[in-house]
Amino acid sequence: MVNPRLVHLKKRGDFLRVASARRKFVTPSLILQARPHDKSEAGETAPIRVGFTVSRRVGNAVVRNRVRRRLRAAAEAILPEFAAKNSDFVIIGRPAARDKKYASLTGHLKSALVQYEKQNKNQKLIAE
């Protein structure tokens, strides 16, 4: 079931905009790239937008799709609670993700989100 608060990134340009923000948080099983967006990009509701990618280094197509499904399930469980509402995220599966348990994947995603929130808070304080 698709979470109504999450919108999936599908276009290459969206992925490139998130990567160009240079906010990257690395964990053993995934890399989280993040970028805040403004309401002019996403509309008034400002949903959480997320994209998933898994490279061929992770395994063949069957393995990559399994990793992508597990990352998608973890994101749908974690992002609505812990993520900033006006953000775009790209979750990149790493080779270690194929052997990790679901609880480990969600823990890694939470830790990456905590790092992102800390960095966002620090940048807001510096801007003031």
Question: Locations of the language-model features?
Answer:
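Positively charged, solvent-exposed patches that mediate nucleic-acid binding
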Residues: 1-128
